[in-house]
């Protein structure tokens, strides 16, 4: 049996030092102090001390987890990875994840829903890209499939139109055919399916400007003529 002979507060708020039989033994958090009703004069068995130390590791993990998610929402995998960096045992990490979930601070389904909704409001990403990003955050495929399937096609179309209009503004100095090609490629890279891409382009309905198109073709021809300067005139004309 061992007796707690002194408890002192650390400079760090919510942390305490436990002294047993006149000697410093271990630190505890306020949560552990309260849970075990630790007080001067309390007699502890070796088993109880082991339990307290184990609980303290879990409490420390919970504190790290709470601090991590206080800045922004996180997935279970992100919190797990953060705790693993502290070399916490796997069973402790699982206890922390369970506790945070029970407290309502961790909810992967809600995270996926809000992440998708936020991107759909002002974003320009399609379902494939969003799915990839969320899978990297550790969300399960079946969960993502359900969340993405719940989004109406009109919402994806709106996002594709926003992305398409932005892309066209960036390439308005290019020839019409080149604009369309770059537009299709850009929408594919953002994760939209073929049907949504075709509908988005039809909705945007980009039109060629004959006068501007003529000027662009002349500029491109002049550029190619300069680039083919090493060839003879006849071959140069053929290549241009």
Swiss-Prot record:
Pfam families, sorted: RecX_HTH1, RecX_HTH2
First-listed, main subcellular location of the protein, grouped into a coarse class:
cytoplasm
InterPro entries, A to Z: RecX_HTH_1st, RecX_HTH_2nd, Regulatory_RecX, WH-like_DNA-bd_sf
Q: Where is the signal peptide?
A: none
Q: Which GO terms describe its cellular component?
A: cytoplasm
Which key words are in the record? Answer: Cytoplasm
Localization: Cytoplasm
What biological process terms from GO does the record include? regulation of DNA repair
Gene3D superfamilies per UniProt: Winged helix-like DNA-binding domain superfamily/Winged helix DNA-binding domain
Q: What does this protein do?
A: Modulates RecA activity.
Family per similarity comment: Belongs to the RecX family.
What is the protein name stated in its UniProt record?
Regulatory protein RecX
What is this organism's lineage? Answer: Bacteria, Bacillati, Bacillota, Bacilli, Lactobacillales
């Amino acid at each position: 049996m061992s007796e707690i002979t002194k408890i002192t507060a650390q400079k760090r708020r919510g942390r305490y030092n436990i002294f047993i039989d006149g000697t410093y033994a271990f630190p505890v958090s306020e949560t552990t102090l309260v849970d075990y009703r630790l007080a001067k004069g309390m007699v502890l068995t070796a088993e109880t001390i082991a339990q307290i130390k184990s609980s303290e590791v879990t409490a420390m993990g919970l504190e790290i987890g709470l601090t991590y998610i206080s800045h922004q929402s996180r997935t279970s995998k992100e919190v797990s990875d953060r705790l693993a960096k502290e070399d916490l045992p796997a069973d402790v990490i699982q206890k922390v994840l369970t506790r945070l979930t029970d407290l309502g601070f961790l909810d992967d389904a809600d995270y996926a829903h809000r992440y998708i909704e936020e991107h759909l409001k002002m974003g320009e990403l399609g379902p494939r890209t969003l799915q990839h990003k969320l899978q990297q955050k550790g969300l399960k495929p079946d969960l993502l499939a359900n969340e993405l399937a719940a989004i109406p096609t009109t919402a994806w179309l709106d996002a594709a139109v926003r992305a398409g209009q932005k892309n066209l503004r960036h390439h308005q100095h290019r020839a019409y055919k080149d604009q369309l090609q770059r537009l299709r490629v850009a929408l594919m890279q953002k994760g939209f399916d073929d049907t949504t891409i075709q509908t988005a382009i039809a909705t945007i309905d980009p039109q060629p400007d004959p006068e501007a198109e003529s000027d662009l073709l002349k500029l491109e021809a002049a550029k190619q003529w300069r680039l083919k300067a090493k060839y003879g005139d006849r071959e140069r004309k053929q290549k241009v």
